[in-house]
């Protein structure tokens, strides 16, 4: 089938009427317990509909699709202010969440499922936010590998971490419809998307009291299933228009930016190049109705020498920092992951202190409940981003100490009881945390080997930077570390890793058999 025929077939699917099976699938995936919108229809009501009820709901959606208009309740948002911290009399200390009609959100999800196959092939690889099969780990690995290789060959990397002011709320809707047209969203599908915004309005609800309705003419609808994909399309167009020749060369690739929704990192090999890239990006943002926050955007240089990186936006100088937290992980100008691991241990200790009396040692709380909190809060806090760590014996010892600090207290023990860690884990039926970390690292290695050509993490994984290594012992590379881990723990030599991990089912079954690391614990 030719590309023209494929496009026509794709268009006929997305422009066709909405089948009941599609509505049923979306309704079944609704999460129970969610707050209703202005119509007070809860997700449980929709999930309890029988075949007849779903057929009537489908008829309603097809009327909206055919006429290009929706009920007013679907266009109405209920804004509920949530207190953050500080003075309760200050409006800036509240964050508003918007509750939308559940039937309207189901309709929006149906539209989102039709938009995805059209726009996904058109969105640049540099954007990983709100995209299926991608997450923060993709960009965290890409940036880590880029900095690792650049440090090895003494190539400086100039970075600007860009913060956009209230990006979701500033998207001009008129411009957005034009961008959607450019990206192939046209005809009845575009009309259906616009229908959710045509008479957009909101009210504020506080302690049961409601304000008067007021119109909303700009920005994306908070809480709408359509908003994420609409936003990344709009950001992709800004990124495309601001793209230039600058960037950081890594093997055969030149990487100039990384985007995760509105989290933007601009990359260049010199301060001058980075200033040019930032100037273009700022101009495109301004033209698209967005503004860069100069107080929150920061510059950083990853280099063996201290290098100044003065950057300006609109005549204002950006701060230059020695470390920056990107997507939840701390990156430093020296590129050492030890600072991030230390921070993770410190943050997890703070979490344990905050719940010590109310959870950890509370006798009225069952062990099952305590371990549930351990798995859902403590472990993710301690190990976020662990797939990228290069573990040493010191690191393993510190991670195990942080792990057992919590588990001993759950078991009602202390170090003075001189009970082995393995005994405590066996009693609590908890998997060793180091085993979880190593299994995840090897799982990510297999994922990188299997990534198709064109995916950025896979490309930098396979690429080798060029240049001359300076004198001295090089740092341990993540790939060397995890290859050695596979050899030590699974008996797979480095030259066979790609072949073995290339079969996902085989690799997953091997990892499920990974035994705990032998040791004194």
What are the language-model segments listed below?
Residues 1, 33-36, 55, 67-72, ...:
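Short helix-interrupting loop/turn segments at helix-coil junctions
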Residues 1-91, 106, 330, 468, ...:
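Surface-exposed loop/turn segments and immediately adjacent short secondary-structure elements
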Residues 3-12, 187, 204-224, 228, ...:
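Short linear motifs embedded in intrinsically disordered, charge-biased segments
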Residues 16-28, 56-63, 110-115, 139-151, ...:
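Inter-domain linker/hinge segments that demarcate the starts of reverse transcriptase
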Residues 19, 38, 42, 53, ...:
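Hydrophobic (often cysteine-bearing) scaffold residues that line and stabilize catalytic clefts
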Residues 33-41, 79, 89-99, 137-181:
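Conserved catalytic palm subdomain of right-hand nucleotidyl-transferase polymerases, strongest
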Residues 40-49, 63, 127-134, 161-167, ...:
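Conserved short loop/turn motifs at secondary-structure junctions
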Residues 92-123, 138-141, 165-168, 217-245, ...:
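Conserved pre-motif C helix in the palm subdomain of viral-like polymerases
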